Structure formats: structure tokens, C-alpha cells
């Protein structure tokens, strides 16, 4: 078999974890030059004999999506052609559909969705609350400089609580009366000496963490009443809140912060490092060195992997569990400018989204490093933040003064079920 020239046949086994799409587990002889299109035709022909309708599939060969000819994929992986090759096929994830464009008065630098609400933060110093159907509910003044990050603390039918951080060197705790549609600033959190670029609420909603241009990581109480011993009566009465913990270790701005669990924090920084912090010990548990400034980072509780967004147009994947944390597991190519923001899906183990200064959002599968699954178009200028906290909606904000809302598979399936 002249495999180097892409000729001849390859013995393959076709496998799927979706049992209703399973085909007979026997060796199939296929041409080495086949692509995803031909494999789709082949598998669908086998399924058609069972009475199934046509389905679009993607194909995984040695844990990576097939994006060209099978022979080229195997040659790149240095895989022998002598033995039967296992090919896994999965139903193709549907393309997210544009749903809404939410117009703001200035750059939208922070977005976070929860339930039927979307919280946004802008460069005009205001917060905004919207429904995920595109209705504007409230504009909230309070900060004195552009807002850089937001996160929900808790949300039910009657009350919403959230936190915002800003270039004005503060974070603010807010309480929203949903029925009356009124918002109160519960506390102004002071302690940083420069702008606060990142904020994240703990899984139990009792604390939140902030990362700043002053290189400090700070942890604060998210409770309505801060009963800490270090809080003076004067500060309580003025609504000022001070940090419970201050952690030093980064050399430049902390651009990303996320809770990995109840006592562990992940931070990413312009100093080219990721750090994992143990709050029970109040110190660094692990460090991952990279070769680029990190603009954003995202940790997945489903697969324990970390993604980073950087200035060199690429996204990178690291394993939080390995002792060789500086080794890049994968690099994802597709953006044409700085990648500003990245986030794992909270429900789909392999999927994540990114936003870039090339004006594009992209939906990825971490097993497809050479190309995204889909480009999510709509922004006319730089994408500044992206969020997939609500599994139904991918939400992004940009310097075109808009928030773009895309319906993901969960919302699309629900829409089909109600028709």
C-alpha cells in the first residue's frame, strides 16, 4: 500500500458512543484519501439500511477531529497503516443561531448570563440588566470609571445579587429587587491600588475574588452583612468593605480569576503565568509558565483542563493535574488578532468559545485544534468578553457597543420540542 502518496485502502473500525447510531462492528476497507464528507456518506449508507434518516457526523481519529484526508491525518500522527484504525463518529454539534443584538451607549466590556437575565458592564461606567429575549430592564450608575468584569452571586424570582469591578479601583456589591426593579449598592469594596480587571464568585456564593493591575489577588465576603473582625464600625456604616485575604505572587496585572473549587483559585496574568492558589494555606499551590501575556483563562470542572487567550492569536490548553504544567497540551489556530476572551461550556465537556480583536467569536471542540467548529459572526469591532454560563446562550460584548446573543444547542432543541 503506497500510503505516502495517499493511495490504497485502510482497514477501519467505526465506533460511536451514541448507540442508536451504531453500525456493525466489523472491519471496513476504505480509501486512504477519504475525508469527512466521504465518511459521512459511507456511515449514512450503513444507517440507511437500518431505516435511519441522514445525520451529519464528525469523525475522531486518535482523539482528534479529522479535518483533511485520512491518510494525511495518520501520517501526521505517525500512525502505522498496517493495523485496523479505529474511527469514532459523533453527531455534529449544531451551529449556534443569532438571536439578538443588544445596543449600548459605549463599549461592552463585561457580560454574564444567568437564568433569563443578562448582566452587562460598559465603558460609560454603567451596568445594565437585560432579559435573554433582548428587553432592557435597568441601567445602573455607580462606578466612576469603565467596568471590566461582572458576576452573579445569587438569583431567584424575587432577588438578584451581583458584583462588578472597575478601573476606578473598586468592586461593588449590588442587590436587585426583581419585582420593584430597583437596585441598591450594598458595599463598595476598597483595597486595590489600580484598576480591577477580573472578578469571580465562589461556588457557594459566600465569597468573591478580584484580580487587579496592582498585581494583587484579593478575596472578599459576598454576604450582605460583612461581620468580619477587621471591619470597623465606621466602614460598616459607610458601606465600605475591605478584603479578607490579600495574596501576592504575580509580577504584572491579573487579567483572569476563577474559582476551581471552594478553596482553590486560578489566576492568569500579563506576567505570562497561570497560578493555582490554595486559600486554606493562603499561598501558591501550582504555577504554569507560558510564553505570552495571558488576557483570559478558563478552567473546566468537567475535564480539569485550562484554556488561555493571548496576544499571539492563539488559544492554548493546559492540564491542571499534571506536574509538567508548563507543557502545552494543544494550541488552537483560527483567530487573526489578539484573543481577548475564552470560556469553557459548563455542560459540554469538550466545547468552548472565544472572542477576539478580529471581531469574531468562535465555537471550538478541544479535540479540533486546527479549526473551530463555527464562526459566530455579528460584531463589527473587537470582542471584549464572552460568556457561556447559561448553557442555552452564548453571549458576547464588544467595542461596537453591542451584546450579541446566540442560541446554543440546548435552546435550539427546546425550540424544536415546542413546535
Swiss-Prot record:
A Pfam family: WD40
Cited Gene3D superfamilies: YVTN repeat-like/Quinoprotein amine dehydrogenase
GO terms assigned for molecular function: ribonucleoprotein complex binding
Ubiquitin-like (UBL) domain as annotated region, ranges: 10-91
Protein localization: Nucleus, Nucleolus; Nucleus, Nucleoplasm
Organism in which the protein naturally occurs: Drosophila pseudoobscura pseudoobscura (Fruit fly)
Listed name of the protein: Ribosome biogenesis protein WDR12 homolog
Family: Belongs to the WD repeat WDR12/YTM1 family.
Function: Required for maturation of ribosomal RNAs and formation of the large ribosomal subunit.
GO term, biological process aspect, one: maturation of LSU-rRNA from tricistronic rRNA transcript (SSU-rRNA, 5.8S rRNA, LSU-rRNA)
InterPro entries linked to this entry: G-protein_beta_WD-40_rep, NLE, WD40/YVTN_repeat-like_dom_sf, WD40_repeat_CS, WD40_repeat_dom_sf, WD40_rpt, WDR12/Ytm1
A single GO cellular-component term on record: preribosome, large subunit precursor
WD repeats: 103-141, 142-184, 191-230, 249-287, 289-328, 334-374, 378-416
Keywords: Nucleus, Repeat, Ribosome biogenesis, rRNA processing, WD repeat
Record flagged with keyword Nucleus: yes
